[in-house]
């Protein structure tokens, strides 16, 4: 039987430096008999030569479009918004299963071309637990940025400036500690932070960043399902300086915060980091903004407030790219056992479940989306 060919595409999302495959996992796949083609990429945190040394074949950027149909296309974030049908099996995050804006157009490209989406967000084991996720580093980066925005707001009237990725965690934390020191000098105290979803991967990452930045336990309110069971909005959020939302959303729940709950004279809340960033989802429990932010413009102000301090929202949907090397290594390591079964993915439980979900979602597409 011919070896299975994996084609790692270059990411097109602005400032996305992460990679679903790393040189380390590429070497393991090649050792197991796979052929790995890697598109050259000026953005990827790993140099092209690192993949070449691991045994991969370097191919031109965007060459996946013309790759043989049987090649499996591996990527990370969503494809560019184009209209041509997709013929391959694609392994990636597509962000089209939770009725996000434009989901029909994104999803319909696969059945229109005879292709298949195996969405990384929904790869689960037999217990329904995700086999690999960027949650920890998303929470870590989100909480780190939230601390920097809090300090910035106290000392500047203009919006928080753009940020770039860091070579490692130590460099990020050094910057955050410096910012917190400046914030404390202005506020006269350390910030109080509430993290909702604190027991999961994302929330534990957020709490880890807060502690490494010098925020003591007594200033961190770490909530999970038990604490939110009574239903919001929650005064504890507006009493905190920073709110980091780390919940994984699958259905509508009572709002954690809304415009009405923010209109209180004693509001302390200055920064919301919505790590979940389900900005356009009808399920969002943080319906106080409608704009997805970027590393170029990390915050969006909450308009319409009549009292209290300014309030900024961070809603970057690829926060782990702030720490691209560490985030990629951790994710790809966790994904590797599943990647090693791609040569028989139809009969591998993890991939078969992803295919079943794809089929279910395709069945909900309006006929008009399939006719383009």
UniProtKB/Swiss-Prot annotation:
The active site is at 77 (proton acceptor), 95 (proton donor). It holds the Pfam family AlaDh_PNT_N. It catalyses: L-saccharopine + NAD(+) + H2O = L-lysine + 2-oxoglutarate + NADH + H(+). Its EC number is 1.5.1.7. Catalyzes the NAD(+)-dependent cleavage of saccharopine to L-lysine and 2-oxoglutarate, the final step in the alpha-aminoadipate (AAA) pathway for lysin biosynthesis. Monomer. This is Saccharopine dehydrogenase [NAD(+), L-lysine-forming]. PANTHER family: SACCHAROPINE DEHYDROGENASE, SACCHAROPINE DEHYDROGENASE [NAD(+), L-LYSINE-FORMING]. The keyword Lipoprotein does not apply. One of its GO terms (molecular function) is saccharopine dehydrogenase activity. NAD(+) binds at residues 129, 200-201, 224, 228, 248, 275, 316-319. It comes from Neurospora crassa (strain ATCC 24698 / 74-OR23-1A / CBS 708.71 / DSM 1257 / FGSC 987). Belongs to the AlaDH/PNT family. Pathway: Amino-acid biosynthesis; L-lysine biosynthesis via AAA pathway; L-lysine from L-alpha-aminoadipate (fungal route): step 3/3. SUPFAM superfamilies: Formate/glycerate dehydrogenase catalytic domain-like, NAD(P)-binding Rossmann-fold domains. CDD domains: SDH. The keyword Oxidoreductase applies.
């Amino acid at each position: 039987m011919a070896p299975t060919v994996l084609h790692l595409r270059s990411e097109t999302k602005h400032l996305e430096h992460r990679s679903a495959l790393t040189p380390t996992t590429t070497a393991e796949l090649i050792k197991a008999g796979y052929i790995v083609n890697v598109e050259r990429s000026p953005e990827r945190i790993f140099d092209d030569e690192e993949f070449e040394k691991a045994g991969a074949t370097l191919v031109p950027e965007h060459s996946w479009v013309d790759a043989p149909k049987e090649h499996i296309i591996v990527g990370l974030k969503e494809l560019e918004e184009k209209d041509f049908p997709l013929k391959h099996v694609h392994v990636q995050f597509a962000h089209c299963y939770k009725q996000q804006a434009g989901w029909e157009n994104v999803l319909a490209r696969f059945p229109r071309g005879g292709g298949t989406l195996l969405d990384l967000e929904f790869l689960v084991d037999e217990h329904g637990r995700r086999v690999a996720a960027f949650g920890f580093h998303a929470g870590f980066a989100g909480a780190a940025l939230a601390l920097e925005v809090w300090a910035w707001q106290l000392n500047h009237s203009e919006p928080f400036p753009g940020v770039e990725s860091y070579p490692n965690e130590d460099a990020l934390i050094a910057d955050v500690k410096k910012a917190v020191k400046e914030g404390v000098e202005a506020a006269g105290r350390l910030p109080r932070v509430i993290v909702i979803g604190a027991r999961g991967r994302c929330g534990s990452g957020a709490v880890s960043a807060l502690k490494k930045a010098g925020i003591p336990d007594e200033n961190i309110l770490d909530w999970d399902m038990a604490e939110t069971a009574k239903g919001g909005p929650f005064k504890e959020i507006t009493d905190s300086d920073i709110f980091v939302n780390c919940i994984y959303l699958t259905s509508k729940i009572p709002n954690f915060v809304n415009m009405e709950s923010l209109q209180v004279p004693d509001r302390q809340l200055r920064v919301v980091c919505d790590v979940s960033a389900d900005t356009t989802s009808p399920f969002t429990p943080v319906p106080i903004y409608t704009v997805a932010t970027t590393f170029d413009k990390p915050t969006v102000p909450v308009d319409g407030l009549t009292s209290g301090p300014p309030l900024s929202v961070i809603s970057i949907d690829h926060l782990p790219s702030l720490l691209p090397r560490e985030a990629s290594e951790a994710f790809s390591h966790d994904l590797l056992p599943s990647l090693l079964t791609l040569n028989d993915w139809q009969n591998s439980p993890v991939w078969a479940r992803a295919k079943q979900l794809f089929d279910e979602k395709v069945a909900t597409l309006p006929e008009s989306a399939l006719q383009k």
